């Protein structure tokens, strides 16, 4: 994971973005069906490279339109500015699939802090929740891992290891409840979503897919 300047980059990027689609009971963040730019980035999103060159593409995996992330000793993310009131849309759902985990990855140590799939929910310049598919850390673990003063990034391990590797997994999280549990207060609006992959700490490689990211009413 990459925390320095996380929130500044999520909230202050100057890319002209397409609006989030709101339709009654849901707010579509992306279904990877929107047009892509000349560089292959979906409309409304920004590709941010931290270490090395990004290997991202919008693909069809069977009948699923998805964002494919490949990492070889690199770190990069796809991010979008959004505005979501969690009192109205508390549920975040998405599909993800990991086809290769970074060998030895474990977010609990800075030297091994690599994951094939991470979904950041940014609330401000100082607070975020990140849902991860880790190589080693146990499912259900929740920890503050930000090394930056005055910034809190709460990590929630949703998947770990190879048990479901190569399979599409559907996740649903009540982000409103998660925020109250992790921060002990009412959540502010969600300001940004970030999809990330990295393998530079372990010097390995990884691959994952994301699809159908949206917020829903309860």
What are these regions (language model features)?
Residues 99-167, 206-209:
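Extracellular ligand-binding interfaces
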Residues 8-18:
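Bacterial N-terminal signal peptides
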Residues 23-49:
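Extracellular carbohydrate-recognition regions
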Residues 32, 193, 212-215:
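Extracellular beta-strand elements of beta-rich domains used
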Residues 114-119, 151-152, 156-161, 165-203:
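Extracellular beta-strand ligand-recognition surfaces/modules
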Residues 81-92, 162-165, 186:
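Extracellular/lumenal carbohydrate-interaction signature centered on repeated Trp-anchored short motifs
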């Amino acid at each position: 994971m990459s925390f320095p300047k996380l929130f500044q980059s999520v909230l202050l990027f100057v890319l002209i973005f397409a609006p989030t689609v709101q339709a009654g009971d849901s707010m579509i963040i992306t279904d990877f069906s929107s047009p892509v730019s000349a560089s292959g980035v979906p409309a409304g999103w920004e590709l941010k490279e931290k270490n090395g060159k990004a290997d991202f593409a919008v693909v069809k995996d069977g009948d699923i339109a998805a964002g494919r992330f490949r990492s070889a000793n690199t770190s990069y993310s796809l991010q979008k500015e959004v505005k979501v009131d969690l009192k109205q849309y508390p549920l975040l759902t998405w599909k993800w699939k990991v086809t290769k985990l970074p060998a030895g990855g474990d977010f609990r140590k800075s030297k091994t802090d690599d994951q094939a799939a991470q979904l950041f929910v940014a609330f401000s310049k100082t607070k975020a929740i990140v849902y991860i598919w880790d190589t080693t850390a146990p499912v259900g673990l929740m920890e503050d891992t930000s090394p930056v003063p005055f910034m809190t990034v709460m990590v929630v391990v949703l998947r770990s290891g190879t048990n479901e590797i190569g399979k599409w997994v559907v996740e649903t999280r009540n982000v409103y409840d998660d925020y109250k549990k992790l921060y002990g207060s009412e959540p502010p609006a969600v300001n940004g979503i970030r999809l990330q992959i990295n393998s530079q700490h372990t010097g390995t490689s990884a691959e994952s897919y994301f699809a159908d990211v949206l917020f829903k009413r309860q």
